[in-house]
Amino acid sequence: MNIKQLTLIAVTVMSAVTASAQYDVRSSSSQYLPAWEPADVSMTYGLTAKGVRYAPIWGLDQAWINQQNLKKGINHMGKENIGIGRSAFRFTKALTNDSVLSSDIIAKMRERASIFNQVSDTLPIVFTADQEAGTNEYFVKNQVADISHWAAMINSHVHWMQQNTKHPVVGVSPFNEGDYWTKEEGASPVRQLEVAKLLRKNPRFADIAIVGGNTLNNDKALSWYSSGKNYYEWGNTHQLAGSFDTFAKFYQQLQKDGKVGYGDEMHNVGEAMIGLEYGMTVGIWWGFDSRARGEFCQISRHGERLAYGEHRPNWTAASVWRHDDGRVKAFIGSSERQAVTTNYQFVSTEREVYYDGYGPVRELMMEMPGGTGYQNGQTNAERVIDVTWGEDVAPGLVNGIYKLVNKQTGSVVAYESNGNGIVLRKFSPTSKKQQWTVKPCSHQTGGDYSFYDIESVENSKIRINVRDYSTASRAELIAWTQDKPSSNEQWYLEYIGNGYYYLRNRESALYMTAATDAATARVLQTTMLPEANRDRMLFRFLPLDVDYETTAPGKPHGLTAEAHAASVKLTWDANTEEDLEGYMVLRALQGTDDWNTIARKLKVTEFTDNTCCQGDTYAYRVKAIDLAQNLSEASESISATPSGERSMIARWQMENNLYDDTQNMMDGAAYGSPAYVDGVKSGTKALRLSATKKQYVQLPYEVACSDELTVSLWVSLRSTTAFQRIFDFGYDENHYLYLTPSNGTAIRLAMKNGDDEQKLDCSVKLPASQWKHVVVTIGGGKAVVYVDGQEVGSRSGITIRPSDIRPVLNYIGRGQLSTSPFLAADIDDVRIYNYAISAEDVQTIMGGGELTGVMSAKDTPSVPHKIYGLDGVRRTEPRPGLNIIDGKKVLR
């Protein structure tokens, strides 16, 4: 699933929760709960966890001369993160007296050095072969390199560089892709070794690394390196063919041998991520795309890696990093020529976050597109995702038709005609030249797809274009027409606060900026301006019918908090502004200033927070936001503690919806549109899950975080496949609590917390096509499983508590492991208690009775009563679930 679809997903998830609501407003944390397509690779990370720190050296290439690539690299990476450059030696003309380079070869070397001077005139340089320029028979004859001439030619290049520039030469690759350019280079592993031996005898190379490998196909890199590894200080391969396994193995071998792992032609951020994982320490970008590579170079040098995942057969990888300044970013990448489409799931184990503005959620599933074969349908896709949280987050997803309003001037971005400059103008509702469709770019756009397309409403082929692909500050922006967007027409939205964004160009990394403070100023791109001028760089995306103004709504009043066992219900007084869009709910642990936005743009004046932990004390505040995206001051804070008192904290009766009948409002979300069917044990409907369609239910993040736990449900299996999951609460293959109806011979309950796993195998397995009442209790150091009210297995000495696992991915019908079969079954009346109920209680609930403190609706007298839902809305008659009848809880 690509990021372009996130807005649709958010709407779909909301609709799934509320579609059946004819009488209830379900304003709770559960309205944001997604149920994603099962991912190929799942990655978990803790925002505050200790990560892995690396010290890579990243560089840029001019072996294939392209000054634009270097300028893009400087702008996206920052000069401080460029530590090496790759130049090249040529062999188009014979050496004079076996030592003197021709003038045209020197001119090319001087050109490369001059380009590198834009980074630093002392930037370290590595040489490789420029075989595409052509070959002279003096160097190669009958596809066999003349070793002595070849070594002399390399020596002459190094000598010239040392004598005529300040660039230190730190390494030399004797050949470049010698496994492929056999005619041009005449190389072989043996000839590469012989060149290395000659260079090693030369005092000039005493402090210069000789690089081994240097193959196009990474399957061949190890053999090209191993035969001469006693002469090679560095090992290098390209990834233009070859398996993931041999790529990783090559860098692991270099690390084992104490050599420098080097990649002098990286084509995708995936190579950099994988290389770091297995031993690469020096990497050079062959060409330079844009943001993902630049931000990866920054954060990998000034941060810690929190998570890493890979799919070897599909040649893709992903990682999550935390910068030393606190920013967190996720990256996905692939092979340039061999990738297969892969779905990656990112899971935050500590708190709800926003992925490029999508949230508040714990997880995101992102599709990394691939092709249909080697160099077939490949897009060289890569991406970076901002992971954010806090008191002021992006107010919503940007995907629609807007006017772009400049903060400094209050004017909107516009154009007069194609080919002319982008300007600021006073907004006119009738001018479509001031209206823009802003949408995430397609994941098939080619290369980095971390950007947005901005198209004119008047003509969707007209976009905001940086003239001539300029990377210079104060370059002009123009309206330009073409069928598909180019890199100088795509933009990154960087949220700054109070509804404002920076817009940064994909090609240049520079900022869209009003040229002056005038209301009719031209629009340019610039570097970061001094703080006093930065309002010229800030923009809001506003609907066409919303006036731009900067008067914030009044701060909300009357905030109250009602604590329940596993949730906190907030209510507040309504604001009176006519242009009010909604409310933002903020939460922090009591005694901290670590506020996070846990709900956005609520239309009602109540919200039930069920992402809180039982027993912890929280502070809450509410802000108002208007249609112009102005945020109010926060309300006065109020504190509340979900009590954790023994109770049923959630119940799903599957009555054509996944509503929780308790006041905690822990509504579920389903993937695959499972059906509701007759033939039930409670109410009128049951939920049918199809294994072939990979259907499952996701329960809220904190539903199983108590020290003790009871899960009760009715289940009728439609398959006896071993190791299906009735439920599985956890977040990865090392943290789970699951129940399978059969491990092949018996019901199994298993818990794992890191390296510690505890299992309970029962005396029976569940049959197919029969309704069975199943209860699992965990507490007091004991786990018990009941079927139809009878104990079928127990184990004492249980030391793992559900709260130790801290499950956040709580599934009905699927497992944490990608290999676990999906459940084929009908499910009904799922209940969760935050304590271990007794054997007598099991009998009671199986028989339709209620536990202490809750009476049955069927026992209420048939006379008029005051009947309310948990939301306080009066009803004409009791409905399925919990009702408040004459002030008492009644379960129907």
Regions found by a protein language model. Give the residues of each.
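Beta-strand-rich modules
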Residues: 609-630
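Short surface loop/edge beta-strand patches of beta-sandwich-type extracellular domains
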Residues: 690-709, 759-765
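Flexible glycan-contacting loops in extracellular carbohydrate-active proteins
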Residues: 795-826
